[in-house]
Amino acid sequence: MNPVPAQREYFLDSIRAWLMLLGIPFHISLIYSSHTWHVNSAEPSLWLTLFNDFIHSFRMLVFFVISGYFSYMLFLRYPLKKWWKVRVERVGIPMLTAIPLLTLPQFIMLQYVKGKAESWPGLSLYDKYNTLAWELISHLWFLLVLVVMTTLCVWIFKRIRNNLENSDKTNKKFSMVKLSVIFLCLGIGYAVIRRTIFIVYPPILSNGMFNFIVMQTLFYLPFFILGALAFIFPHLKALFTTPSRGCTLAAALAFVAYLLNQRYGSGDAWMYETESVITMVLGLWMVNVVFSFGHRLLNFQSARVTYFVNASLFIYLVHHPLTLFFGAYITPHITSNWLGFLCGLIFVVGIAIILYEIHLRIPLLKFLFSGKPVVKRENDKAPAR
């Protein structure tokens, strides 16, 4: 069994927080990109589209690696049932809280913004269910996926731990070439599964819950397990934290391929399958790029960084409806895309931080948006003198 590191992994905490916060410029730039979203500017911006594609190509892949790393660390700290309970509470409670408080009002707002409120009663029962699945889960999808992954990893992590007890992990060697081949095969395997589903029963791919619970989990699970393995094997972790020109160059070429597929691919052909293969290896190489960069520049303790590490989940949860509100009611009055983008950042981040500070002063909200019980200090229990 692995000992839990005594020293805090500051750079991983920081990377995870900044990847979460990157969701803000990602969604604001989506308004000004050429991609169709709930709300869009009158004219798309080429550079903001490129910026949006860059963030989207790797952000959640690296995020799930870090999630797997910390998840296995906690797996060794707690008994199995307590580990599952703690992990599910910390992601499940904020998700269930955000649905009635954030994504439901967001859905109602969009119904009127997009002029769909009047047609809602005419939808079939299934269409209403599926629309609500997509719209209420919305940007919370990764929390649902983490709940599913945690449940699956009750068995997977047990198998990994049992195998480690019967093998010598010090002799386990990894190389980026071998990992690249493995992830290329995983990408091809995922593409085959998706294409098979598309041929056999294509409507299921547009089902929101199937997409989140099955397809997204299936795609991101290898990165989650990779994070756990990086915690177990120091050599693998060192492979990611050591700068590699080869990974940087390969990631750049893969991103170009990603853009070409976005530009010339067709959803009715092989665009989504090709994207899964490209992003699977791109995500692996970007783990090295991001980890090595973060290890060099972010591996320190800072009160300011700690503040945003603690605030990142709450800010991410509330930013999405704020972004859509900005896009629906403020964007049409700003003619410059770049000015609108900057104003959007100030608007969303500013209000999100204010809401974060307010929620810290309300114990119930603090618990609901973190999933962590409020611990009273001993001196709070002491009688006044």
From Swiss-Prot:
Any one annotated GO CC term: plasma membrane
Pfam families: Acyl_transf_3 (PF01757)
Transmembrane segments annotated in the record for this chain: 17-37, 60-80, 91-111, 137-157, 173-193, 212-232, 239-259, 274-294, 311-331, 338-358
Membrane topology: Multi-pass membrane protein
Localization terms from the record: Cell membrane
GO molecular function: acyltransferase activity, transferring groups other than amino-acyl groups; transferase activity, transferring one-carbon groups
Enzyme class: transferase
Coiled coil: none
Alphabetical list of HAMAP family matching this protein: MdoC_OpgC
Annotated family: Belongs to the acyltransferase 3 family. OpgC subfamily.
Protein name (Swiss-Prot/TrEMBL): Glucans biosynthesis protein C
Species this protein is from: Shigella boydii serotype 18 (strain CDC 3083-94 / BS512)
Gene behind this protein: mdoC
